[in-house]
Amino acid sequence: YTSLTMGSLGTISTGTDTGGASYKYDEEVPQAYEQTSDAQQNSANIVGNQMDSNSIVYNSPSFDIAGISLSMDAEYSPNANGIGAGDGAETDKVTAFVAADGQGGNFGKGYGLGATAKYQGLTFGAYGSERENNDPTLGATKVRDAFEGVWYAKYSMGPVSVGYSESYLDSGLNAADVAITTAKGIRTASGIFSSESMSIAFNVNENLSVSYTSTEDTYDDQSNTNGGVEVADVTQDSTALQIAYSMGAMSVKAYQME
């Protein structure tokens, strides 16, 4: 991808695999090594990644207001499928949607906006994105626009940092289009995927740091029916104990995850 840095005016990026604006916000809790999605996937890591390619991303510089350091990130894609195209080519809206999301049809524009505020040891960030779903193949069971969002808060005091984050992902698909017995995948299933993470990290000294992270990922079908078949919510719990040691140019990092 290509980036244009404009000094005090910020940075504009475009191309493939830019990371979009969401990479600054998803799973953003203190960790000694890696996010909990490094060993397995969770919905928080997916939030906003449909804007990773075919998009224009703007990152503002930091500016101070009443002692608070603020920054903003904005992104726009005319074809928000997260799939890149070669020089002189374009992605096909129909086949790209099938490949990326498994639902057929097409989709349109995508928008994303994030903001970060820092005050002394406290950092707060929030991001949200929306993507148009336009699927003419579903007839009466029309889809609606998808929404994905995440927020986090971190606080550092001396060698100790704590953090908490929540994410929300609604693909906008209709429950009638997904069989009850079908495995519920992110962006292929109706309902809502939500996640919450909390962590604590400790810098033992300038070379050694450790952290503990707990993540709970929940799928809610949103059927909420008094009759017929109710699809039970499913929750995935994961924990990670991490350690990192560095000495000069050498570093050793490891984690144990369940």
Features from the language model and the residues they span:
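Outer-membrane beta-barrel proteins
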Residues: 1-258
